[in-house]
């Protein structure tokens, strides 16, 4: 017992030490220890998630985009451009049967790239780079800026201020364009190469890459949502950007921002939409509080790097634009620099502009990313002084969702009937429009399908989101870039893996590259009558946008390619292949082979045995490894599957009567029989010569007494001269196996064992 300073023991007023008081203090001490341990565990989890985010940033794909590689004869091939911290890659994805890398350079960080088209007057005399084409514009990292921070370990972060022109023919750099300001995007056509900076656009001649003219724009808004796709679009003849309204233009000004669904009284759908918007806003506000708390902690252990498409580089022009110029879009002619039209597309600053292949449809998006507007550009041809008509038309309002997101990618189909919009949340939204639509009022459209690239949820997702927010990314965003493009397959090709060609194969496919480094091919087809639960699965409530997916178009995954997983990026280039896809050998290291994603029907998933019962063709083993590796635990702790109370149970699927009677009907999981997979340990013994030793008889006797659960699905593997080994890991001798009673099909009968023997087993 502890004593006071004078040597006396602490006592209660009546002279007796209170035993309950000591118990209370002990309980309080234990409670504080538990709270402290839990807090330290949370802190270690946050630090681990933050550190893993920094370490994986070096190997991940920082930027990705699909583009067209133009050949000398004018034909084009579809390529995938990947930017890494160590360099860049160019993949040929025109033929999905022969996806391979054609360029792999590792000479410095690449932020984003753009294939340069051949100029209109391409020739030996007019084209300065005639012998070096095709060309690739690479924005490099050879200039750096100091990021101001209170942290003592703040680092210099590279920013792209130079455009390096890379020749795919000679595999070398042939030209360099240097700028003083930060570069945000590069767009080109057969006439010019436009480089977007903080407050201006420099236009270069496509043949000589010499400075042609400059356009003053609105300042790039570099908030927490970043820049995204970029407020610059270059079509075959026109260039679109965000700038101040030009007073000399007689173009009409588009001022309507809120479009009513109908002129009559508000409907139930509109009321539900408004209520969902308020609910989503409240949930977002509650979530921001938790993110801010974790972000404050994670910011102490994370640097502040630039992440392409998510975090703005440097500081743009500090000049604040007037309210009238915010959200203003100006379309000019590339040749004569005249204004075609100008209109106010959004109330917020513009973050994304994109033309379709014809150059007549223009897609706009703001920094919030809630709605995407589609306009038709209609230039006036008449030179008379009569009253001019409107030079543009607002056709559609594509509703992405209520939450803020960065628009990273916009893609049109050949006929411009389909539009895919990729956001920083890892979701590709597919919209269907009618380009020939007539009318004055824009039509609100919801996504007919959404393709999610996957993100973490729960506590791990919260910690990862806070770590990403501390690194400068948007809360809830996925590191990297989501990009997509349309491809068109022939019905006679081998791209159909999951059904008959007449019913399932579609000419229109979609290639989607996810931040994880995988490219997936999806088949687009209309829903057929009578497909049952597959049609119902396409209709549901989207938790991200709060909108209901209509499910008019089925999006089925066909194949998947892993571009960077389990391979060295420095050893993937094939020296025998050319830039146009020829010469690639079958066993070339530069080629990646797809993983077939096949959707089995009910009839294919079940096979009828000789006795009339049904069972799954291939015995699938489900493991918890993929779920467990996402959790952060101490090395001294046991994994989840190794704990004493954890059990593996196998589903005994023997439902022949239901399958034969109902086909694809639902079944209750409570009615499915299960069988526990028992685990037990034994001492390691040598295999060779062990059964002939004197101790072998004792082990054999112990094996006879040990329980076994051999059934029809348990396979028996024969050991050469030493007995058999079952799936449960118990080794039996040949004499023991022959002495066991065997039924008509040659399968050993299951033996009964007592409860005492069960208690001796080790979990």
UniProtKB/Swiss-Prot annotation:
It is a peripheral membrane protein. It is found in: Preautophagosomal structure membrane; Vacuole membrane. WD repeats lie at residues 345-385, 402-441. Expressed in roots, flowers and leaves. Residues 701-711 have a biased composition (Polar residues). Transmembrane segments: none annotated. Residues 701-763 are annotated as: Disordered. Induction: By sucrose and nitrogen starvation. Signal peptide: none annotated. Gene3D superfamilies: YVTN repeat-like/Quinoprotein amine dehydrogenase. SUPFAM superfamilies: WD40 repeat-like. Keywords: Autophagy, Membrane, Protein transport, Repeat, Transport, Vacuole, WD repeat. GO terms for cellular component: phagophore assembly site membrane; vacuolar membrane. Its main location: membrane. InterPro entries: BCAS3-like (IPR045142), BCAS3_dom (IPR022175), BCAS3_WD40 (IPR048382), WD40/YVTN_repeat-like_dom_sf (IPR015943), WD40_repeat_dom_sf (IPR036322), WD40_rpt (IPR001680). One of its GO terms (biological process) is autophagy. It comes from the Eukaryota. Component of the PI(3,5)P2 regulatory complex at least composed of ATG18, SAC/FIG4, FAB1 and VAC14. The PI(3,5)P2 regulatory complex regulates both the synthesis and turnover of phosphatidylinositol 3,5-bisphosphate (PtdIns(3,5)P2). Required for autophagy. The first protein part may form a beta-propeller domain involved in specific binding to phosphatidylinositol 3,5-bisphosphate (PIP2), leading to the association of the protein to the membrane. Belongs to the WD repeat PROPPIN family. This is Autophagy-related protein 18f. The gene is ATG18F.
């Amino acid at each position: 017992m502890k004593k006071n300073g004078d040597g006396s023991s602490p006592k209660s007023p009546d002279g007796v030490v209170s035993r309950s008081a000591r118990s209370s203090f002990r309980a309080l001490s234990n409670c504080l220890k538990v709270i402290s341990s839990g807090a330290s565990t949370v802190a270690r989890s946050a630090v681990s998630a933050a550190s893993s985010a920094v370490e994986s940033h070096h190997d991940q794909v920082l930027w990705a985009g699909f583009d067209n590689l133009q050949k000398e004869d004018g034909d084009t091939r579809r390529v995938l451009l990947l930017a890494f911290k160590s360099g860049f890659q160019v993949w040929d994805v025109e033929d999905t049967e022969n996806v391979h890398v054609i360029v792999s350079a590792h000479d410095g960080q690449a932020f984003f790239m753009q294939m340069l088209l051949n100029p209109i007057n391409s020739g030996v005399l007019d084209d300065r780079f005639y012998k070096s084409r095709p060309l690739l514009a690479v924005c490099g990292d050879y200039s750096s800026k100091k990021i101001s921070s209170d942290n003592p370990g703040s680092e210099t972060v590279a920013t792209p201020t130079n455009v390096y022109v890379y020749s795919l023919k000679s595999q070398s750099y042939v030209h360099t364009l240097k700028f003083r300001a930060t570069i945000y995007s590069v767009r080109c056509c057969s006439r010019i190469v436009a480089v977007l900076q903080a407050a201006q656009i420099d236009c270069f001649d496509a043949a000589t890459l010499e400075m042609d003219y400059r356009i003053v724009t609105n300042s790039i808004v570099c908030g927490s949502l970043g820049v995204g796709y970029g407020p610059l679009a270059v079509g075959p003849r026109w260039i679109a950007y965000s700038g101040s309204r030009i007073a000399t233009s007689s173009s009409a000004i588009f001022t309507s921002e809120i479009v009513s669904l109908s002129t009559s009284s508000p409907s139930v759908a509109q009321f539900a939409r408004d209520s969902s918007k308020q609910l989503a806003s409240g949930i977002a506000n509650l979530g921001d509080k938790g993110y801010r708390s974790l972000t404050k902690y994670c910011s102490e252990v994370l640097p502040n790097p630039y992440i392409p498409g998510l975090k703005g580089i440097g500081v743009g022009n500090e000049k604040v634009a007037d309210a009238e110029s915010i959200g203003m879009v100006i379309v000019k002619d590339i040749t004569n620099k005249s204004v075609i039209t100008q209109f106010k597309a959004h109330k917020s600053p513009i973050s994304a502009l994109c033309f379709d292949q014809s150059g007549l449809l223009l897609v706009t998006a703001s920094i919030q990313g809630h709605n995407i507007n589609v306009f038709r550009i209609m230039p006036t041809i008449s030179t008379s002084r009569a009253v001019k008509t409107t030079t543009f038309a607002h056709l559609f309002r594509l509703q992405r969702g209520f939450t803020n997101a960065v628009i990273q990618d916009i893609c049109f189909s050949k006929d411009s009937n389909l539009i895919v919009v990729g956001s920083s949340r890892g979701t590709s939204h597919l919209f269907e429009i009618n380009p020939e639509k007539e009318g004055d009022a824009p039509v609100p459209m919801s996504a007919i399908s959404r393709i999610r690239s996957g993100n973490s949820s729960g506590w791990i997702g919260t910690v990862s989101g806070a770590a990403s927010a501390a690194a400068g990314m948007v809360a809830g965003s996925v590191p990297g870039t989501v990009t997509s493009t349309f491809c068109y397959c022939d019905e006679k090709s081998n791209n159909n893996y999951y059904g008959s060609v007449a019913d399932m194969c579609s000419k229109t496919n979609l290639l989607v590259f996810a931040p994880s480094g995988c490219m997936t091919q999806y088949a687009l087809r209309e829903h057929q009558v009578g497909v049952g639960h597959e049609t119902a699965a396409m209709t549901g409530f989207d938790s991200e946008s709060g909108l209901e997916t209509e499910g008019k178009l089925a999006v089925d995954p066909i194949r998947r390619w892993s571009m960077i997983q389990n391979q060295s990026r420095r050893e993937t280039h094939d020296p025998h292949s050319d830039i146009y896809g020829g010469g690639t050998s079958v066993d070339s290291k530069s080629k990646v082979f797809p993983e077939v994603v096949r959707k089995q029907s009910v009839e294919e998933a079940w096979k009828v045995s000789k006795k009339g019962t049904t069972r799954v063709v291939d015995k699938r083993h489900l493991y918890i490894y993929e779920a467990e590796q996402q959790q952060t635990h101490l090395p001294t702790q046991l994994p989840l599957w190794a704990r004493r109370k954890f059990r593996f149970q196998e589903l005994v699927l023997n439902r022949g009567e239901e399958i034969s009677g109902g086909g694809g009907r639902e079944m209750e999981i409570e009615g499915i029989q299960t069988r526990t997979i028992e685990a037990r340990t034994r001492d390691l013994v040598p295999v060779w010569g062990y059964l002939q030793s004197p101790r072998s008889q004792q082990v054999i006797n112990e094996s006879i007494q040990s329980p076994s659960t051999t059934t029809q699905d348990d396979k028996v593997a024969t050991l050469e001269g030493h007995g058999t080994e079952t799936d449960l890991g118990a080794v039996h001798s040949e004499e023991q196996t022959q002495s066991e009673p065997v039924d008509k099909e040659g399968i050993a009968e299951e033996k009964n064992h007592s409860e005492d023997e069960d208690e001796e087993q080790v979990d």
